[in-house]
Amino acid sequence: MSNTKITFYPVKNGDTNLIEFSDGASMLIDCKFRSEAEEDNDDYDVINDLLTNKLKTKEKGLPYLNAFVLTHPDQDHCLGFAKKSFLNKNPETAEPTKEDKDSKLILIGELWYSPRVFTEHEDDLSEDAKSFKKEAERRMKLWKNNDSTKNKPGNRIRIIGYSDVDDLKGIPDECISAAGDEICKMDGKKRTKYRFFIHSPFKNSIEGDSRNETSIVMQIRVDADGSKDAGKLFFGGDAEWRVWKKIQEKTSDKKNLEWNLFEAPHHCSYTFFSDDRDSEPEESSLNFLDNRVGNGYIVSSSKTIKKNNDNPPCQKAKNRYIQKLDDDDDYFKCTEENEKQVPVVFEIKSDGIWFDDGSKKKEQESKSSSIGKREHLYG
């Protein structure tokens, strides 16, 4: 059995994060599927890597992804979702067509949907966000109607958080998870090697007028080689500092705040630390970073971080993070360094998180190539 791997794909300011669990299941947290990379285009071809190297399981003749989580419906977190996914049809009653298969549309086993998050963004949803919501509503209807195919691959759904607008009557409690809940099931199966702790969205709004104050925030704890919770991963979309403050206030068991792999929220924006980049960081944000265990890593899913006025990414935020990494910038990774887009890959082992620098692949390429080493894409 292989170890769990986490890949942060380079999509400039945006998120496309793939987790390949040790039991063979896969989860994608957000997506930004740009146009396929061409020879004259430096954009990394995420879809090609997913379809060629990652999603090797097939269901109904389509590449199969066990779960897709949309932290919030901003376009840089769901771009290309509609074009690349098998949607709006029950795969049990409407078999994928030859065109669907030729297009290699991704069949998503289970959709993780937060009605509360969508409520805060409903005035300006993109077409991709609308497609996601429509698909979520299709799946919810199957559960409400107790359809015999509701728990089949491509029809499953997990509701994250509370809802002010969607009627959840008929959807079993086991498919609904609120802040403070731990999830040990994914895509219809009990998962014994990893678990998800939901921190946000909250039942009640928090003070502030930013749309980035509603987002799915979760901790994923992963076992490895007999070591329980060897990996402690945190994903929070674009959640700003008030969210992280409230998470700490609401969390009684401090193990649910620990991390050794943390994705810098909002593409390394300073909003994790404060509203204004010229302000001192909020004490609560610094306190959260103190929950690091072992040699933890922080990842910025963003364009190259420069000393300019961009926010995101923000050089000042990066500096704050590095200070909390014992001033060791080797533990801060960005998906684009010096304008070069490179997936950032980690592996969970019994003693924690390991950065995959691609050394094994480099060695294999060096041995197999008579004309020198090819450009290496994985770190």
Regions found by a protein language model. Give the residues of each.
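Conserved beta-strand hairpin/beta-sheet module of binuclear metal-dependent hydrolase folds
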Residues: 1-63, 214-239
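Flexible, acidic/histidine-containing loops and adjacent segments that form or flank the divalent-metal
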Residues: 1-4, 60-67, 78-234, 239, ...
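Flexible loop/turn segments at secondary-structure boundaries
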Residues: 14-15, 36, 76-77, 120-121, ...
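Short, solvent-exposed loop/turn and secondary-structure capping segments
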Residues: 17-20, 29-30, 39-41, 79-82, ...
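Active-site metal-binding motif and surrounding structural segment of the metallo-beta-lactamase
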Residues: 27, 38-111, 253-274, 298
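Active-site metal-binding loops of divalent metal-dependent hydrolases
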Residues: 30-34, 73, 116, 201-203, ...
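Short, flexible/disordered intra-domain loops and linkers
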Residues: 35-45, 121-132, 271-281, 306-313
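Long, structured stretches of catalytic cores involved in phosphate-ester chemistry, encompassing
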Residues: 242-337
